[in-house]
Amino acid sequence: MTINKQLGARIRYLRQQKNYSIEDLSLEAGVNRNYLGDLERGMRNPTLIILNKIALALDVDLSVLFEGIKEI
């Protein structure tokens, strides 16, 4: 699994743990809903700025987004 797919799966997992829909998270983070959906499917290469917005919206440290991600 690519790093982008692992990261997307991790974001989806954290979003679901907060019981947020993609729409909820996109509004809270200020990130386009379609972009966020693509990100969760591993189709985007997000910047640190975008990842930080998502982490803040999920109320987690940025490093939490990378937990469990294995380098290929």
Question: In which residue ranges do the predicted regions lie?
Answer:
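Short, charged recognition helix plus adjacent turn
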Residues: M1, V64-I72
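Residues within helix-turn-helix
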Residues: E23, N34, N52
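Short basic helix-loop element that most often maps to the first helix and adjoining turn
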Residues: A9-E28
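Conserved hydrophobic/aromatic packing and binding residues within compact polymer-binding modules
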Residues: I11, L25-S26, L36-L39, L65
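DNA major-groove recognition helix of helix-turn-helix/homeodomain DNA-binding modules
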Residues: I49-V64
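Recognition helix of helix-turn-helix/homeodomain-like DNA-binding domains
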Residues: V31-R44
